[in-house]
């Protein structure tokens, strides 16, 4: 069975430090410049503590009619951060996402270092590949049976 680290996105993880004076406006700018839908919030020691997604920005800034340049990173982030270990199974990751009603999981190594991000899309692509591989094997077997 595949592990999380095998299918997690290998895009660069964008982070912002809590208590750095950064605002929701800064986060939106980071998201746009880096073409990402989420940013991990880390503490001063580099440990992950929260996440800011596009949805968080809409719910906590736009819908509340708050100026993005006045609201702090800590007030926008979702916390505590829900994570998955790099060598956990895809099945475990799917259950964690379903149970918590989230679309992304931060992937950690044993030392709590961020090594990737796993999204629902990553899991769907992985499952689609498995189905296509199985179908190709079936067709090969079917062809072999038809020849005999």
Label each region the model flagged.
Residues 17-35, 42, 84-101, 108, ...:
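The conserved cystathionine-beta-synthase
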């Amino acid at each position: 069975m595949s592990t999380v680290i095998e299918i997690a996105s290998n895009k660069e993880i964008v982070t912002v430090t809590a208590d750095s004076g950064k605002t929701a406006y800064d986060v939106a700018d980071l998201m746009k410049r880096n073409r990402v839908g989420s940013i991990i919030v880390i503490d001063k020691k580099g440990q992950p503590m929260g996440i800011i997604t596009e949805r968080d920005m809409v719910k906590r800034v736009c819908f509340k009619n708050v100026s993005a340049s006045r609201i702090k990173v800590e007030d926008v982030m979702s916390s505590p951060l829900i994570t998955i270990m790099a060598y956990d199974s895809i099945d475990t990751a799917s259950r964690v996402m379903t149970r918590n009603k989230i679309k992304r999981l931060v992937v950690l190594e044993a030392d709590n270092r961020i090594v990737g991000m796993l999204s629902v899309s990553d899991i769907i692509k992985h499952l689609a590949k498995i189905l296509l591989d199985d179908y190709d094997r079936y067709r090969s077997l079917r062809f072999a049976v038809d020849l005999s």
